[in-house]
Amino acid sequence: MPQKIGVLALQGDFVKHQAMLQLLKIETILVKKPKDLHGCEGLIIPGGESTTLTKLIQKCNMYEPIREFTAKHPIMGTCAGAIMVASNVDDQRIEPLQLIDISVARNAYGRQIDSFVTHVDVPFLKGSERFKAVFIRAPQIRNIGSQVEVLMELHGNPIMVQESNILALTFHPELTSDPRIHRYFLEHFFTAQALL
């Protein structure tokens, strides 16, 4: 297990991710500047508002530092974070980091009023009960590259995907009391790193 995980803290529900990591006894660093990445062994890009997140990442000069960080460290993007790690987004106002070979549509399930909670199978966690997935103005993954693995689906649409050391989720695992998704991020990627 890693010692320190960064949570991008420019906008969005980063405090909820921090609380989930603390529940798992992981020290967190709230990342607001490039230098905050030093000492982090992984990074979570939280949900929020992707056009605002684009502007803030630009303003804080975080694009290249985050891209360089992925050369050695895993990243998990949730909701707007999934939009930010995508290769392509259906909105020209967004400048994605292009870390995972997926195309994403913003707010694909509708407006805030159309947000919903549902229980979803977790096939990559053997014998696990269903996960309570919270979708808030959620994006939808429309296309995936040949190296992208689909870990969870809802009505045939990918909602959690992985490529190399990048994990993208269209829902909010931090808004539940269930730590399984965060634990997977910590255990899967850091066990794999240890084997290299």
Region roles according to the model:
Residues 10, 78-80, 100, 137, ...:
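A secondary-structure boundary/capping signal
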Residues 28-29, 75, 166:
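Hydrophobic anchor at the start of a short beta-strand
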Residues 50-121:
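Cysteine-nucleophile active-site neighborhood
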Residues 18, 86-88, 146:
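Short, well-ordered secondary-structure micro-motifs
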Residues 106-196:
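Amide-donor transfer/coupling interface in amidating biosynthetic enzymes
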Residues 45, 77, 169:
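Redox-cofactor binding/interface segments in oxidoreductases and associated redox assembly factors
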